[in-house]
């Protein structure tokens, strides 16, 4: 192997190691989401509808996602702060955690949905 080939090979290995290290650091950590992304707003709308389905009184209406984070795991966890209103009550803020296994298949699970006091 020539010196030039060895240097190129070493540089390529270094680049791969840096990229792999950067990717590994982000897996599992929470990162902000763009609340203006239509997909994020759809996840918030879905979370409210899913929660409303399980509540006897019902009447919860999605307003908007105001903040959020995502966590890449075997799929993606979304922790969303959202506003919703209910019939006969004042508007409220809620935190919803939605697990989305694959955005293309709409395989979702509402992990939690809690009012923010």
Swiss-Prot record:
Predominant place of localization: secreted
Site (Reactive site): 28
The keyword Secreted appears for this protein: yes
Keyword Secreted: yes
Pfam families with a match to the protein in the record: SQAPI
Domain of life: Eukaryota
GO terms assigned for molecular function: cysteine-type endopeptidase inhibitor activity
Family of the protein in this entry: Belongs to the cystatin family. Phytocystatin subfamily.
Biological role stated in the UniProt entry: Specific inhibitor of cysteine proteinases. Probably involved in the regulation of endogenous processes and in defense against pests and pathogens.
Descriptive protein name: Putative cysteine proteinase inhibitor 7
